[in-house]
Amino acid sequence: IAGTHTNMKDCCLLAGCCTRRDIRFVAKRELLKPPFGFLFRMSGIIPVDRKIHDATVMPAVNKILSEGGMVGIFPEGTINRTDDIIMPFKKGAVRMSLENNCKILPFAINGKYKRGKLKIKFGDAYFPETNDIEKETKLLEQKVIKLIKECE
């Protein structure tokens, strides 16, 4: 699954109420530090060092997906604290899909976790149509923007 990142609670929300399958999220390595590191470790996050090209992420993702697991990623790479509808997407979600021949399930979370204001919208799962990672990443961005607008 791939979509917007509006708050630290996104992973819990998606994992807890949107599927019966476990979702292993790609998340910044810093989350493994105290005080909550043990919780993130227990949740099985796939840690990524965002300061470097972390070569350990794709093998971990490939293993999970090859075993029928589900991986969650926030293609913006961080929580969007800007006024922009989304930040430019990184290519990881499309790479994961292409390398593992698996569908991408786009989603949008709209709202800032104020009482009664949160909405989640899922799109249709799809396979990228081409091997053009740049083009397919832009297409994923467009799908997520459409979902955000449908949440308004």
Where are each of the predicted segments found?
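Short hydrophobic segments within beta-strands
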Residues: 1-2, 26, 74, 107
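Catalytic core of membrane glycerolipid acyltransferases/transacylases, capturing the structured
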Residues: 2-52
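Short alpha-helix boundary/capping motifs
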Residues: 30, 54-55, 86-87
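Short acidic-hydrophobic sequence patches enriched in Asp/Glu that either
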Residues: 35, 53, 88-92
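Helix-adjacent hinge/juxtasegments
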Residues: 38-39, 43-72
